[in-house]
From Swiss-Prot:
GO MF, one annotated term: creatine kinase activity
Pfam families with a match to the protein in the record: ATP-gua_Ptrans
Family to which this protein belongs: Belongs to the ATP:guanido phosphotransferase family.
Keyword annotations: Allosteric enzyme, ATP-binding, Kinase, Nucleotide-binding, Transferase
Gene3D superfamilies: Glutamine synthetase/guanido kinase, catalytic domain (3.30.590.10)
UniProt GO cellular component terms: extracellular space
Functional description taken from the UniProt entry: Catalyzes the specific phosphorylation of arginine residues in proteins.
Binding site for ATP: 24-28, 90, 124, 175-179, 206-211
Motif (RDXXRA motif of the pArg binding pocket involved in allosteric regulation): 336-341
Protein known as: Protein-arginine kinase
Protein EC: 2.7.14.1
Regulation affecting activity: Appears to be allosterically activated by the binding of pArg-containing polypeptides to the pArg-binding pocket localized in the C-terminal domain of McsB.
Designated gene of the protein: mcsB
All copies of domain Phosphagen kinase C-terminal, residue ranges: 21-253
């Protein structure tokens, strides 16, 4: 398989319901093959067996009819920087990128469908779409899952459901999540109370790259915590309601800023745009924060002519691995910061 790592993923399109606040919607299904230990207990031969079975399954006509052409890429054939780009594009986890052994990623051309092979579970099927499209992502994931289950013997228990390495995934094996941009809630100091209240309704809040990461650039991921005893529709409907409520609260906070701190807000946005279009050195953390301010300005019509697609692409293109891959060489942190600033200036200049 020949990977086009610089391709823009489907989730970056920046169009769809609630796209002013909801960046992407993701459905992930955890599945394991019957008769084999979980990946953390497998030897390399067993890992290779899983990769081989998945490779055969994705070539089945039924799978093609359900989701189109899928291609498998063994991770051992990728350089560390190439693996890291897949993390930066939200296609694989940091754990899969870092691990050795027989591991793989399966991708559709538009990267809306991907499968991590031999991560925490044998298969982690993911459907990742732009904006608030959880139900559409679920339909795609469900079709892919049904087609794959026709080719693979998944570990399933009549009482407990799909068996997974982590007990919190047992049952449907489904993790639904949305990625939201919530700068006004942060600026008005409402983010802490609002987001901490979500844990009481079974919703987890994480940073830009999921579990264990910080909410850089005012971007948060919210997801369901438990799958056992709940149907797929219940999980998705609950997270959809939470996401829409969060988006409404963010809009209310934006209006509060507009009414009470209009000049400070416009100054903040203008300064951020000025730095991004003129800076010669930019760290990834500073760039993400400034892009958050500019995105807020674009969404509130303080800045005209910037579309969501470009801002979503920049979120990935400013990351260390993507920068080095596009430059065709390994860079020192300072070289990356200089290259990042030049790239941002060029892309914002249009």
């Amino acid at each position: 398989m020949s990977l086009n790592l610089e391709r823009n993923s489907k989730w970056m399109e920046g169009s769809g319901p609630q796209a002013d606040i909801v960046i992407s919607s993701r459905i992930r299904l955890a599945r394991n093959l019957k008769g084999l230990p979980f990946p953390n207990l497998m030897n390399s031969d067993q890992q290779a067996r899983v990769v081989s079975q998945v490779s055969r399954a994705i070539q089945a006509p039924m799978v093609f009819q359900a989701v189109g052409e899928l291609k498998l890429q063994p991770l051992r054939e990728l350089a560390p920087v190439e693996r890291q780009i897949l993390v930066e594009k939200h296609l694989i986890s940091p754990d899969l990128a870092a691990g050795g052994g027989e591991k793989a990623v399966v991708l559709r051309d538009d990267e809306a469908v991907s499968i991590m092979v031999n991560e925490e579970d044998h298969l982690r099927l993911q459907c990742l779409l732009p904006a608030m499209m959880l139900h559409e992502a679920w339909r795609l994931a469900d079709a892919a899952d049904d087609a794959l289950e026709n080719e693979l013997d998944f570990a399933f228990d009549q009482e407990r459901g799909y068996l997974t390495a982590c007990p919190t995934n047992v049952g449907t094996g489904l993790r639904a999540s949305t990625m939201l941009h919530l700068p006004a809630l942060v600026l008005t100091r409402q983010a802490g109370p609002v987001l901490s209240a979500l844990t009481k309704v079974g919703v987890a809040v994480r940073g830009l790259y999921g579990e264990g990461t910080e909410a850089q650039g005012n971007i948060f991921q919210v997801s369901n915590q438990i799958t056992l005893g709940r149907s797929e529709e219940e999980i998705i409907n609950n997270l959809s309601a939470v996401t829409v409520r969060l988006a409404d609260q963010e809009r209310e906070a934006r209006e509060l800023l507009r009414r009470q701190s209009r000049w400070q807000l416009e100054d903040r946005v203008g300064r951020a745009y000025g730095v991004l279009t003129n800076a010669r050195i930019l760290s990834s953390q500073e760039a993400l924060q400034l892009l958050s301010d500019v995105r807020l300005g674009a969404e509130m019509k303080i800045i005209r002519g910037l579309d969501q697609r470009l801002l979503n692409q920049l979120m990935v293109r400013i990351q260390p691995a993507f920068l080095q891959f596009s430059a065709g060489k390994e860079m020192t942190p300072m070289e990356r910061d200089v290259h990042r600033a030049a790239m941002v200036r060029e892309l914002l200049a249009g």
